[in-house]
Amino acid sequence: MSAGTTGQTTGEEWPRRGEPDGRGPRIDPGEAAQARRLVEAISHTFDSKVVGQEALRTALLVGLIGGGHVLLESVPGLAKTLAASTLASTVDASFSRVQCTPDLLPSDIIGTQVFNPGSGTFTTELGPVHANVVLLDEINRSSAKTQAAMLEAMQEKQATIGAKTYPMPNPFLVLATQNPIDEEGTYVLPQAQMDRFLLKTIVDYPSPADEVEMLRRLKSGALESRTVPPVVSRQDVLWLQDLSRRVYVDEALLRYIVQIVHATRHGGDYLPQEQARCLEYGASPRAAIAFVQAACAHALIHGRDHVLPDDVRAMRYMVLRHRLIPVSYTHLT
C-alpha cells in the first residue's frame, strides 16, 4: 500500500502547500519551534528518571499531546508507574494510581456520595480517576461493571455520581497496564473498551547498556527522588493539544490511512490466503481517526507542522495491535 501515488515518498513534497484542509489556521514556524522546545524539555526530564524506554516515552507523549489514552502491556518491573508519575510531574499535573482488583467497585474509581449524619446532607467525594494522569494498574483484573465506569470517564471525560455529572480535569490521560504472563483471575477487556485506547504499546526489557546506566544512576543517588520539578505547565500541554489538531494532513495521506485500515478488513485482497484467514475482524473507522490523531501528534513532537508518511508508519503497530481480532486457533485446525 502506498501513500497515494507516491510510493514510499517521505520527503518535503509532503504536504502539497496551498491545499485547504478545513482545520483552521496553519501552524507558523515560531509555533512549531516552541512546540519542539516544550517537547524536548519534557523528554529530557523524563529521560533523567526513566532510563531507555524511548518507545514508551513516545507513546506517552503521543497520547498526551494527541488527547488519547494508552494501553501498556509488559511484565512487572519495567518502570511503568515511574514513567507515568514522572510524566505527570514534568507537566505539573496531578497523578493517581489505582491497583485494579476483582472486588474494586465503580465508586472506588469515580467517587461516591457520603452521608453526613450531623448535617443530614450528602457530600460528594471524588475518586482517584479525577486526576490529570491516571494509572490503572492491571486493568483486566477489574470486573466488567468497574470497567464500564472507567469507559465513561475515558470516552466522555466525565463521571456521573448520583444525579450529577463531574467533568474530568484537563488535560486528562489514562494509562492502563496489562501483564501478559499472569492471566489467572483476570477479565478480558471487551473490544469496545480496547478500541477506546488511542494506542497500545508493548514495553520491552531495557537493553544491557540501559540497564547498566540504570544501576550507575542508582548507585550515584540520581534516582533516589521519584519526583521531578515541572518544566512545562498544564496550559502548555493544552496549547500543544490545540496545535496538534492544526497539524496539516494531506488528502493523499488520508487515503493512505484509509487504505491501511481497509486492508485489515479485507485481508484476502492484500495477503496470501494462509495469512488472511488468520484475521477474523479488522479495524473499525475509529482506527482511522486514531491514525490521524497519533500521526499529527508524532509530527508535532518532531517539530513539523505537517504529517509525513513516516509518521503514519511509525504509529501503525501502536494504533492497530489492539484493534485486530485474530481467528481462534480452534477455527484454524
Question: How would you describe each model-predicted region?
Answer:
Residues 116-134:
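Conserved alpha-helical scaffold flanking the Walker A/P-loop in AAA+ ATPase domains
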